[in-house]
Amino acid sequence: GLRYWKSQGSAALLGKVAAKVKTASTREIPYQKWIVRHLPSARELERQRREKFEFQPKISIVIPLYKTNEKYLRQLVDTIRNQTYPNWELCLSDGSGANSPIARILEALKASDERIKVVSHAEPLQISENTNAAIEIATGDYIAFADHDDELTPHALFECVKALNKNREIKVLYSDEDKMSMDGHKFFQPHFKPDYNP
């Protein structure tokens, strides 16, 4: 304060104040706290479920599978079923080959929801062939790509359709992505993508 100003002078005091202000303004909020603040509340998710868009495109979520861990597969499907936007179909291509370890679970998933489509292959497929096979069974207006160990936040498709309703000329949408702890309680390593700039 005053003692520092008397001993060091005005320029030194201003420099010290500026450094403190800069430090305070650039202090980062821990990401986990930030993401929790920005995820929609249960009330907001319910509001989204009731909202009826003028334009309601079907979104085909295509996923290539290869000997996928059953736990991750179920978690993925649960996050898709839990979407606040309901007009989707899930197109799964099992490229595991003969005696696929996930054949039974895929049949059960297909039987449980008419929006889930499955195609299986006798021979193992590379990821590009497997993805193309999933695209071939898609009937939606838009295609969304996901990996077999991904999860979607409940409002993911809602936000895409909201953007499409604001601008029907949109041909391609992309989103930010994040990593999540194995127990699903902690988010880390966000990848915030910039606005499209050709």
Ranges and model annotations:
Residues 121-138:
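Glycine-rich, basic loop-to-helix element that forms the pyrophosphate-binding segment
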Residues 151, 155-187:
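Conserved donor NDP-sugar-binding/catalytic core segment of glycosyltransferases
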Residues 63, 91-94, 173-176:
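Short beta-strand segments
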Residues 77-87, 166:
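Short, acidic, metal-binding catalytic loop of nucleotide-sugar glycosyltransferases
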Residues 14-81:
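N-proximal low-complexity "stem/linker" segments adjacent to membrane-targeting elements
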Residues 143:
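Short aromatic/hydrophobic "clamp" motif used to bind/position activated sugar donors
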